[in-house]
Amino acid sequence: MENEIELIKGCRAGKDSARKELYTLYSKRMLAVCFRYTGDMDAAHDVLHDGFIKIFTNFSFRGESSLCTWITRVMVTQSLDFLRREKRVSQLVVHEEQLPDIPDISDSGGGAGISEEQLMAFIAELPDGCRTVFNLYVFEEKSHKEIAGMLHIKEHSSTSQLHRAKSVSYTHLRAHETSQDL
């Protein structure tokens, strides 16, 4: 903890050694966060770069959360800004009656034996809007109301896109399980 305090002080003072250490400590984890949102490694690297530039030019960490949580929040915001700029956050509205019922994977015993890499690949294959809502809902634990506000969409659109993401993921999971059984 004492080392983290020194790191924070160094970053606030603009010390290159502290910035380098911060980048070394968090860049791999934050690249994974950026990739979860963008679904494209080149874009994830761009977002990561922009996020760290933002952190280093305006080190506004106030200590209200852990340093890792704050950096993650910056990277999520950068990822959402990137998706908005690229117009990749779809505002597609799917009516719930058009969506199939999806069994709960935990009830059906599905998902066992799937690697984290495979799960991340499934997430990366989701359409941009669905992937964004899925990440915010599942990993960032945001409500549909919060997601709607962040993405400037209707709350129902958030719900629909999460359902669509689950449906696509379920289809991928079943196909993966079938290929493993062969």
Where are these predicted regions, by residue range?
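A short pre-motif secondary-structure segment
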Residues: 133-137
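Internal acidic/polar
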Residues: 1, 81, 89-116
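Arg/Lys-rich amphipathic alpha helix in sigma70-family domain 2
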Residues: 62, 73-94
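Sigma70-family region 2
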Residues: 12-13, 49-67, 86
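Conserved RNAP core-binding helix
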Residues: 7, 23, 31, 41-58
